[in-house]
Amino acid sequence: MKVRVRLAPSPTGTLHLGTARTALFNWLFAKKEGGTFLLRIEDTDIERSREEYINDIYDGLQWLGINWDESPTIQSERVNEHKQIIKTLVDKGFAYKCYASEAELDEMRETQKRNGLAPKYDNRHRNLTPEQESEFIKSGRDPVIRFKISDEKLISWNDLIRGKMTWSGKDLGGDMVIARRAPANSIGDPLYNLVVVADDSAMKISHVIRGEDHLANTAKQILLYEALDLNIPVFAHTPLILNSEGKKLSKRDGVTSISEFKKMGYTSEAMANYMTLLGWSVPEGINERFNISEVSEIFSFKKVNKASAKFDWDKLNWLNSQVIHEMSAETLLENLEPLFKENGWHLPSHEWGINLVGLIGPSMVLINDGVDQAKPFFEEQELSEDGKKQLEIKEAAVILKFILEKLEDTDAASFSKEKALDLINQATKSCEVKKGLVMKSLRAALFGTLNGPDLIQSWVLLSRFSKDRARISRLI
């Protein structure tokens, strides 16, 4: 069987983490099997679909390194084909027009609830006589079109993740609406389960890989495949992604879209790495820190768990820090320089920028951390409480005055690590204080705090702007 898989997002919002994980599993499976990964935009919800969301989906997938093999299919462009299929189902007796009003359906559901029953359509208009149908039309009622589902029907399939699955027709909510309300002489807008079957068949999809929240849809869609005498694809239902409280991850949890993760400073490599781990168990001997192109060679649904995956921020942050620490200084600077420019910061030289990222990179977890850590090199900082206390020590002013006098006789462009160390040693000896006092006082004066990366390297970088002199002089 030639493997053809697809991602079918709805452009009613930005690319969600769960959708991106589904895309990743489809892409990995296609690569492993030498197959084809396709993209279908399910834009039949005209009111909520937006062009900017389509672009966000494209951008998010490409940022993650997930590229599709053929031009994207736009579902709304096939509406005539969908309606023709619905007409065929009606003509063959698999579907019918239902004239029940929304008020009648609401009353039906309320009655079922009062009687302790699960709400479901009671198939009341499945067998209308021509006379009854004529009366509904005369009264001005517009029908939906429903697909017949027998309560006695058992639907089974072998799921690549969950094994043998069986659903009963009585658990599917009654006869299924496949077209929205429209005048009786027309067909309304086709609905999800019908158009998915039509498009997956037209695209020759061999495997449908999606979340476990689609299990009931799969049972309904298999009935449609059978009624239309179409080849039924292989199904695989991936585990849900849960939040820290064990509930399905949603917008209420804050960051859920790929574009938001990108803005926060997560790397595409770490995101793809982590999303693969949300439901897929790493085979023995394989490190959890990997590139998805490597995993595509070993990916298997046998290693995808049935149990839901819990989103772990600590794990994602660890992976992101690993990716950053593995970056060359050149690559890290490429990521940071646009952010520096957004803040109005300009590098005195490329070499200076390389030295800066080499200094701050080891402590970065997010790309955006580099902005916070680089800020003291571009902008003078307010004194922290510990910085104030340090500079209140009476010897601090003497130390800083000594260092400033020596700096005035030093060329900023040639100031080096060796000269900085020599100057600290001179201050220690001349001011008759401990070296630690000199270094703490100097750090407080230069950067406003007692914490930060290596002081000597930081000082050398700051001296390229001659800002060390200005910052020390204002405190004396």
From Swiss-Prot:
Enzyme kind, highest EC tier: ligase
Keyword list, A-Z: Aminoacyl-tRNA synthetase, ATP-binding, Cytoplasm, Ligase, Nucleotide-binding, Protein biosynthesis
Enzyme Commission number(s): 6.1.1.17
Swiss-Prot/TrEMBL GO biological process terms: glutamyl-tRNA aminoacylation
Motif stretch ('HIGH' region): 9-19
Residues reported to bind ATP: 251
Catalytic activity entry: tRNA(Glu) + L-glutamate + ATP = L-glutamyl-tRNA(Glu) + AMP + diphosphate
Keyword Cell cycle: no
Any one GO MF annotation of this record: glutamate-tRNA ligase activity
Gene Ontology CC terms, in alphabetical order: cytosol
Compartments it resides in: Cytoplasm
SUPFAM superfamilies assigned: An anticodon-binding domain of class I aminoacyl-tRNA synthetases, Nucleotidylyl transferase
Function, in words: Catalyzes the attachment of glutamate to tRNA(Glu) in a two-step reaction: glutamate is first activated by ATP to form Glu-AMP and then transferred to the acceptor end of tRNA(Glu).
Family: Belongs to the class-I aminoacyl-tRNA synthetase family. Glutamate--tRNA ligase type 1 subfamily.
Protein name in UniProt: Glutamate--tRNA ligase
